[in-house]
């Protein structure tokens, strides 16, 4: 359970579940929680790991410290009241301090910092958490094998599967072929044009619209054309989102913003995101661009990943749309 201070809303008290063990058999307790907070916030801690900060601390920016009250009680301090903190703490990814210490003791390195970095590298290949599955084998970019954690704290939720094998397949057609050939039992984000074939073969498609908008992160460095609000508005007006929905076989919802209209955070925006090429062209000409003098931009895009569903087709579609509004985008595909 958890509670926030009656007087000080930056103080959070968490009561930990008794009897929970990490996969290596060590206890999940207050010391472990404090240790895991330190790994991303305390640069002086031996086990501080800068490589984890981006995927942990950046997602809970208000977290400032952790303090042990007793064996199963922890007090967290945030920089300000933050209703999302309990949810965002799932991004901390609790690791076993004892398992890491064993990796540290066995690691080679000229300095403690070198040994710490080596220990985290070894930990990543042989991790120890507290979930219903344990890591059995890990081959980077090839496969991850998980086995059931028979000592999971909740017997009612102990997995019925003995083993799960996860195989990275960046290309949607390769994933689909693996499913249809029986190589795998489940895939994420198949090619939209093969969904009828998949369903005809007796497979079930599970889909659901979710509030997950995948934006382009624009450069606001000095001299960037994106600093001009007219250019940003033009780009938004130039993307045919209904056309993208068709491209994806209907497997998307057309967004009006980061949150949908009617959401408590919607506010009263003055700019209406819609598809209006003529209005976009007018804004671009006001900003000094034209068909004869297009704006040049470069976009780094991912070749894979479930976040943007179909990153290559989607990120090919956007530059095609923008071209009609005097924006020429060169794509740099990153693995």
Descriptions of predicted regions:
Residues 195-207:
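Ligand-binding "clamshell"
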Residues 11-14, 33-36, 74-76, 131-134, ...:
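Short, well-ordered beta-strand elements
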Residues 17, 121, 151-197, 328-330:
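Ligand-site clamp/hinge motif
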Residues 25, 186-189, 201, 320-335:
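Periplasmic binding protein-like
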Residues 145-150, 199, 227-325, 330:
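Append "and occasionally in soluble cytosolic enzymes with long acidic Gly/Pro-rich linkers
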Residues 92-159, 163, 171, 278, ...:
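Gly/Pro-rich hinge or "lid" segments in bacterial periplasmic/extracellular proteins
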């Amino acid at each position: 359970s958890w509670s926030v201070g009656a007087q000080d809303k930056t103080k959070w008290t968490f009561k930990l579940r008794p009897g929970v063990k990490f996969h290596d058999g060590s206890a999940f307790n207050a010391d472990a929680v404090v240790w895991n907070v330190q790994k991303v916030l305390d640069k002086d801690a031996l086990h501080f790991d800068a490589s984890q900060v981006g995927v942990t601390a950046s997602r809970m920016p208000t977290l400032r410290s952790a303090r042990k009250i007793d064996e199963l009680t922890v007090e967290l301090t945030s920089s300000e009241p933050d209703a999302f903190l309990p949810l965002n703490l799932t991004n901390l990814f609790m690791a076993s301090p004892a398992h890491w210490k064993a990796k540290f003791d066995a690691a080679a390195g000229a300095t403690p910092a070198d040994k710490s970095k080596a220990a985290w590298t070894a930990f990543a290949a042989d991790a120890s958490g507290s979930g219903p599955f344990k890591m059995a084998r890990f081959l980077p970019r090839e496969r991850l094998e998980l086995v059931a954690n028979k000592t999971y704290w909740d017997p009612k939720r102990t997995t019925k599967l003995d083993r799960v094998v996860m195989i990275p397949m960046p290309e949607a057609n390769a994933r689909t072929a693996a499913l249809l050939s029986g190589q795998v039992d489940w895939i994420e984000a198949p090619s939209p044009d093969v969904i009828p074939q998949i369903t005809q073969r007796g497979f079930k498609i599970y889909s659901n619209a979710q509030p997950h908008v995948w934006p382009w992160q624009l450069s606001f460095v000095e001299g960037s054309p994106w600093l001009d609000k007219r250019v940003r508005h033009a780009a938004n007006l130039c993307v045919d989102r209904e056309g993208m929905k068709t491209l994806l076989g209907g497997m998307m919802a057309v967004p009006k913003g980061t949150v949908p209209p009617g959401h408590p955070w919607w506010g009263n925006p003055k700019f209406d995101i819609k598809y209006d090429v003529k209005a976009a062209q007018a804004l671009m000409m006001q900003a000094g661009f034209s068909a004869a003098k297009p704006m040049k931009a470069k976009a780094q895009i991912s070749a894979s990943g479930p976040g943007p569903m179909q990153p290559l087709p989607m990120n090919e579609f956007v530059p095609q749309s923008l071209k009609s509004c005097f924006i020429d985008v060169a794509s740099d595909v990153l693995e």
